[in-house]
């Protein structure tokens, strides 16, 4: 009986070890919207560029010292980005001016500095929100609201991509593919991949009539989000199977 008990405990221990993940993800978001985490200095000169770079280096050193191993680096903010893109324009937070080239590639620099420290970099993409009236005005002709207005809806004072329009999956997957194909990222992280708060009033009746196929509205909306995520996942994995795809969901939406 004692031998049997020891044997069962041994098997239980083995099963417990097998259930443990091979690698624990210890991640943090690094927010670039409004320079909330970075950058606090604008890249309007060689000195400003150097200050931006040094500030990021200090933050990454601190994360490494705190035993983090993954940085979720905000790469798409509100209809703008922090790398030279053929799809969207440079974010205001880099230089203080929307669309202005900062004189270097912040995403490439962040990837290189993360990898020097053994940190993974996952490109964090804010998916559905585009921005409020001021942000959209600053983006001007480069904004998706101007370039592809059929994809966009105004709701509660802000603009959003319409998840029910199949073109939204096309648009977001293009951004994810552009980043994945051009950069040595370790992951794509999807944020705000959902309808906005109070989304039951989202103005998508026309889209629902066109694409709903007599499906119940709430289920149709859930399926729209699932299709976008599945599309991005499949196309990222087709380009680079080792790149991880994750999201920041909120259960009540």
Could you describe each region identified by the protein language model?
Residues 1-21:
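Bacterial Sec-dependent N-terminal signal peptides
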Residues 23-25, 31, 35-53, 123, ...:
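Active-site-adjacent "subsite" loops/lids of carbohydrate-active enzymes
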Residues 54-80, 183-185:
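Catalytic domains of carbohydrate-active enzymes, especially glycoside hydrolases
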Residues 73-126, 217-232, 236:
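Aromatic-lined substrate-binding rim segments of carbohydrate-active enzymes
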């Amino acid at each position: 009986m004692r031998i049997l008990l020891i044997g069962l405990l041994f098997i239980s221990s083995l099963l417990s070890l097998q259930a443990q993940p091979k690698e624990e993800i210890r991640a943090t978001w690094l927010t670039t919207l409004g320079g909330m985490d970075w950058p606090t200095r604008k890249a309007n000169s060689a000195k400003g560029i150097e200050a931006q770079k040094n500030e990021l280096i200090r933050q990454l050193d601190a994360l490494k010292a705190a035993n983090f191993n993954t940085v979720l680096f905000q790469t798409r903010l509100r209809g703008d980005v922090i790398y030279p893109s053929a799809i969207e324009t440079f974010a205001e937070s880099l230089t203080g001016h929307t669309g202005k080239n900062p004189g270097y590639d912040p995403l490439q620099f962040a990837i290189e500095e993360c990898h020097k420290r053994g940190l993974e970099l996952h490109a964090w993409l804010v998916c559905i929100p585009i921005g409020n009236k001021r942000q959209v005005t600053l983006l001007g002709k480069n904004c998706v609201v101007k370039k592809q207005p059929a994809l966009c809806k105004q709701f509660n004072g802000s603009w959003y991509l319409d998840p029910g329009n199949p073109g939204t999956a096309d648009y977001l997957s293009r951004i994810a593919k552009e980043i994945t194909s051009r950069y040595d990222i370790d992951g794509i992280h999807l944020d705000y991949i959902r309808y906005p708060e109070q989304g039951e009033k989202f103005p998508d009746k026309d889209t629902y009539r066109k694409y709903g196929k007599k499906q119940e509205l709430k289920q149709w909306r859930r399926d729209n989000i699932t299709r976008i995520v599945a599309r991005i996942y499949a196309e990222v994995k087709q380009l680079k199977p080792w790149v991880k795809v994750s999201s920041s969901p909120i259960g009540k939406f």
